[in-house]
Amino acid sequence: MPVTLADIRAASARIAPHVARTPLVADPRLPQVWLKCEHRQPTGAFKLRGATNAVLTLPRRARAVVTASTGNHGRALAHAAQAAGIPATVCLSHLVPDNKVRAIRELGAKVRVTGASQDLSLIHI
């Protein structure tokens, strides 16, 4: 099903109370380029927007969320799940740096570090 402009506007309105409003700044060296400063989100990346929208649109019967990640999406989903009061499990490979693993755990997610690659960590979902 294609995503429409109305879908995008609805998602934007839905997540607005839950994400930071980040600035849009002009790049002085590239006058036709504007930068959206999503690094200012609480989780440090734009992925919080999609994760929050996904959690907010879960069926009411959903009891938990699970994902595989190399870090940023896992952190975003852990943040969104914590805000919604539902448990999150994030499957990571052994390649993910310890600081990212810690950040996800600090948001209350259960972390499963397994697999020599991200593809192999998907097996545990």
Model-inferred region functions:
Residues M1-I123:
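PLP-dependent amino-acid enzyme catalytic core
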